[in-house]
Amino acid sequence: MDSHTVSSFQVDCFLWHVRKQVADQDLGDAPFLDRLRRDQKSLKGRGSTLGLNIETATCVGKQIVERILKEESDEAFKMTMASALASRYLTDMTIEEMSRDWFMLMPKQKVAGPLCVRMDQAIMDKNIILKANFSVIFDRLENLTLLRAFTEEGAIVGEISPLPSLPGHTNEDVKNAIGVLIGGLEWNDNTVRVSETLQRFAWRSSNETGGPPFTPTQKRKMAGTIRSEV
């Protein structure tokens, strides 16, 4: 098991514990509490996958964070926070690509948490790229404005957008929705790749084909999810 995967999980568990204390003191707003609940489910799933106890991981995560804070000078901390807290807005799409109307021959829509996934299931044997406009904080995707799937010819064949009725979404929500979209498109023998910007800030890694690091099992599961909804 990758040690970075384990330490990341441990730190995430401790940070969730800190956020839970904030919520218990009635200091969190609705989106904060919504993300807290969603992240709790995500941590349980990751813990089960990794075979790690959440309580133990939280304790180790606390030690990691305390060590980092102890080693970091006040000046370095101020400089890090000044740069990290500056939210950036990144754009794969032009204004025209974002605002363009598009139509589906075989429309399919699925709600994936607080996000809506739409795609044209009539599209087959195409090379498709996913582009997105989103904000970034702490070098991680913070808020998705809009994601669209484009063919090489520039046609829009899929889309992911936030649901107005469910404000607030996490990085994991976005990745799950992208997985649903990719699974549905690949079911029809399309080849899907993700823009470099989206790979960098959603996954912080990618595979050699330009796609997110989904396993074959995950891809089959995602494709099956879309197929069962048809």
Swiss-Prot record:
One of its GO terms (cellular component) is host cell cytoplasm. Residues 1-73 are annotated as: RNA-binding and homodimerization. Residues 223-230 are annotated as: PABPN1-binding. It comes from the Viruses. GO terms for biological process: symbiont-mediated suppression of host cytoplasmic pattern recognition receptor signaling pathway via inhibition of RIG-I activity; symbiont-mediated suppression of host gene expression; symbiont-mediated suppression of host mRNA processing; symbiont-mediated suppression of host PKR/eIFalpha signaling; symbiont-mediated suppression of host type I interferon-mediated signaling pathway. A motif (Nuclear export signal) lies at residues 137-146. Upon interferon induction, ISGylated via host HERC5; this results in the impairment of NS1 interaction with RNA targets due to its inability to form homodimers and to interact with host EIF2AK2/PKR. InterPro entries: NS1 (IPR004208), NS1A (IPR000256), NS1A_effect_dom-like_sf (IPR038064), uS15_NS1_RNA-bd_sf (IPR009068). Coiled coil: none annotated. Its main location: host cell. GO terms for molecular function: protein serine/threonine kinase inhibitor activity; RNA binding. Residues 180-215 are annotated as: CPSF4-binding. The keyword RNA-binding applies. Keywords: Eukaryotic host gene expression shutoff by virus, Host cytoplasm, Host gene expression shutoff by virus, Host mRNA suppression by virus, Host nucleus, Host-virus interaction, Inhibition of host innate immune response by virus, Inhibition of host interferon signaling pathway by virus, Inhibition of host PKR by virus, Inhibition of host pre-mRNA processing by virus, Inhibition of host RIG-I by virus, Inhibition of host RLR pathway by virus, Interferon antiviral system evasion, RNA-binding, Ubl conjugation, Viral immunoevasion. A motif (Nuclear localization signal) lies at residues 34-38. The keyword RNA-binding applies. Residues 205-230 are annotated as: Disordered. It is found in: Host nucleus; Host cytoplasm. Homodimer. Interacts with host TRIM25 (via coiled coil); this interaction specifically inhibits TRIM25 multimerization and TRIM25-mediated RIGI CARD ubiquitination. Interacts with human EIF2AK2/PKR, CPSF4, IVNS1ABP and PABPN1. Belongs to the influenza A viruses NS1 family. Inhibits post-transcriptional processing of cellular pre-mRNA, by binding and inhibiting two cellular proteins that are required for the 3'-end processing of cellular pre-mRNAs: the 30 kDa cleavage and polyadenylation specificity factor/CPSF4 and the poly(A)-binding protein 2/PABPN1. In turn, unprocessed 3' end pre-mRNAs accumulate in the host nucleus and are no longer exported to the cytoplasm. Cellular protein synthesis is thereby shut off very early after virus infection. HAMAP family: INFV_NS1. The dsRNA-binding region is required for suppression of RNA silencing. This is Non-structural protein 1. It comes from Influenza A virus (strain A/New Zealand:South Canterbury/35/2000 H1N1). The gene is NS.
